[in-house]
């Protein structure tokens, strides 16, 4: 309802709501896992989108702190964008519009987590933004906003400093504004994404999760983390250029059991235990000339990483 109200106040009138998912239900009967980042959770919404020929599909999770989107490709099929892809599009759009309208602050800052798109830093640098990397969790981003305010730089937060945690409503607002702007230019979000890839190179970001239940699983994760600290030289043929071990509290960040391997050719791998689930998570970021090459490189990196887990 907050998203619907926001869109209506923006002037959108042709809004279709998925009736089966309109009312809260903690059993989540319409999808296996209520995460808008996965295709299964968007399946019912995509059915609705096809029936009404929607231009844009938006979906939030139950507590409305995340938002996922799907847009039509040239074949007329709905394509789900990843959070990283949406983030790159929003970063580029907001920066370009702020410059266009003379509203870019003197010392602009992009705050992102260490597991988020490496390509974002290239986009930020193009627009003159300084990048601040923080640990996973929006509380760390909110903390940085507070520090910027103390320095008199509240405007450095591109969407506003009024939200200190993940907010799907604000995300939906910005996505719709961006979508509408590009529609007036005769291009789609996928078109703009392709333009970004042509400018900065193709970027692929993936997440691999491995479950380890119980106390034995926890001990196993601790053992795996120690193994990753054992001087690994390469992943998938990509040499390790530098290892960032955040258990030492790097760059003024709190100590955290997180490792980030900076690989050659602007690739990276992050491994960390989940803070909320009995899972070990591996984030892989690959830069390549095209999608096919990126997928091949990502697969090789993932295979090497799995050897240290399985």
Regions from the PLM with identified roles:
Residues 50, 54-56, 60, 77-79, ...:
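Phosphate-binding and adjacent anionic-ligand microenvironments
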Residues 25-29, 91, 142-146:
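Short, charged, surface-exposed secondary-structure boundary motifs
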Residues 19-23, 83-87, 135-139:
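Short, acidic/turn-prone active-site loops that include or flank metal/cofactor-
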Residues 3-4, 65-84, 120:
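Short Gly/Thr/Asp-enriched flexible loops that form oxyanion-binding sites at enzyme active sites
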Residues 1-11:
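Active-site pocket-lining segments that scaffold enzyme catalytic pockets across diverse folds
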Residues 11-66:
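N-terminal small/polar loop signature for handling phosphorylated ligands or for N-terminal nucleophile
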Residues 9, 20-25, 139-141, 277-279:
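Active/binding-pocket-proximal capping segment
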Residues 13-17, 77-95, 168-174:
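Gly/Ser/Thr-rich active-site loops/lids in small-molecule metabolic enzymes
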């Amino acid at each position: 309802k907050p998203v619907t109200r926001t869109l209506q106040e923006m002037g959108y009138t042709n809004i279709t709501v998925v009736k089966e998912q309109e009312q809260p239900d903690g059993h989540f009967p319409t999808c296996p896992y209520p995460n808008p980042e996965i295709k299964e959770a968007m399946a019912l919404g995509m059915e609705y989108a096809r029936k009404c020929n929607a231009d844009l599909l938006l979906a939030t999770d139950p507590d409305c702190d995340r938002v996922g989107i799907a847009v039509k490709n040239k074949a007329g099929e709905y394509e789900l964008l990843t959070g990283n892809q949406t983030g790159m599009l929003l970063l580029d759009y907001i920066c370009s519009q702020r410059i266009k309208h003379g509203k870019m602050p003197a010392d602009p800052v992009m705050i992102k987590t260490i597991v988020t798109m490496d390509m974002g830093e290239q986009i930020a640098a193009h627009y003159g933004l300084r990048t601040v990397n923080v640990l996973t969790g929006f509380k760390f981003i909110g903390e940085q906003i507070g520090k910027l305010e103390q320095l008199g730089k509240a405007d450095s937060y591109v969407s506003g400093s009024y939200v200190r945690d993940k907010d799907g409503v604000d995300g939906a607002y910005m996505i719709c504004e961006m979508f509408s702007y590009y529609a007036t230019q005769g291009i789609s979000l996928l078109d703009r994404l392709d333009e970004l890839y042509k400018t900065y190179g193709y970027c692929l970001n993936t997440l691999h999760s491995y479950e380890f239940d119980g106390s034995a699983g926890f001990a196993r994760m601790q053992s795996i983390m120690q193994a990753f600290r054992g001087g690994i030289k390469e992943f998938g043929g990509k040499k390790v250029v530098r290892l960032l071990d955040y258990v030492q509290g790097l760059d003024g960040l709190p100590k955290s059991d997180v490792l980030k391997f900076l690989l050659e050719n602007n690739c990276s791998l992050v491994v960390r235990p989940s803070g909320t689930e009995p899972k070990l998570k591996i984030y892989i970021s690959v830069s390549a000339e095209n999608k096919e090459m990126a997928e091949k490189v990502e697969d090789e990196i993932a295979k090497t990483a799995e050897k240290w887990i399985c």
